[in-house]
């Protein structure tokens, strides 16, 4: 892209929806998505570790209160949904919820803020700066998260039920007759594969659409501000809701994996 060219609305949107990447095709690495997701993960770990080390039984500070509210909320969600015995589920759910919430929250960052900051610091032409700061608007990130959940589902299904029990679950339901076992296997396999697929696409679709609408609003010009703030206010619901849905479905799927029929 020519650094001095004036962008049309379509070029402006396309530019902001393009990742900073190395490589091409399947082997392309999106450096911005990867960098922001790692950074926000470290922010989560640093804050929660710091609060845990400084926790007091006396009057807690505001940050400790906020962390305790989040931990209590996630713990209650796990207790009401997960009926197996696994000490990993609660911390896993907490990590998923807070990490995705932080990544989603990057959607509130004004679309031109980071490119202009990079331009101001480095002097790079704006047309050469690619920075997509919302990791969950990148399907590579959401599919990576969903793949991790899928691996845990398979692992605990085999660990709790054994290989034989897991295969029996795939072949003997919903139809009980032996002649329909192949049909059962196909149906159950499709159902199992649909779980991570739906997790990834739901999160990606909602955040990508949100980012796209912010960009469309930005093309209006100076008249964008009232609409921009209205959409940002609506995102106060969407951003935590998508993190909550991903967490709850993960808990449900892992609970099903722990059920030994």
From Swiss-Prot:
CDD domains the record matches: ATP-synt_Fo_a_6
GO molecular function, one term: proton-transporting ATP synthase activity, rotational mechanism
Topology of this chain in the membrane: Multi-pass membrane protein
Database matches in Pfam families: ATP-synt_A
Assembly, per entry: F-type ATPases have 2 components, CF(1) - the catalytic core - and CF(0) - the membrane proton channel. CF(1) has five subunits: alpha(3), beta(3), gamma(1), delta(1), epsilon(1). CF(0) has three main subunits: a(1), b(2) and c(9-12). The alpha and beta chains form an alternating ring which encloses part of the gamma chain. CF(1) is attached to CF(0) by a central stalk formed by the gamma and epsilon chains, while a peripheral stalk is formed by the delta and b chains.
Keywords: ATP synthesis, Cell inner membrane, Cell membrane, CF(0), Hydrogen ion transport, Ion transport, Membrane, Transmembrane, Transmembrane helix, Transport
Record function comment: Key component of the proton channel; it plays a direct role in the translocation of protons across the membrane.
Cellular component, GO annotation: plasma membrane; proton-transporting ATP synthase complex
PROSITE patterns the record matches: ATPASE_A
Name the record gives this protein: ATP synthase subunit a
InterPro entries linked to this entry: ATP_syn_F0_a_bact/chloroplast (IPR045082), ATP_synth_F0_asu (IPR000568), ATP_synth_F0_asu_AS (IPR023011), F0_ATP_A_sf (IPR035908)
UniProt family annotation: Belongs to the ATPase A chain family.
HAMAP family hit by this protein: ATP_synth_a_bact
Broad class of where this protein is predominantly found: membrane
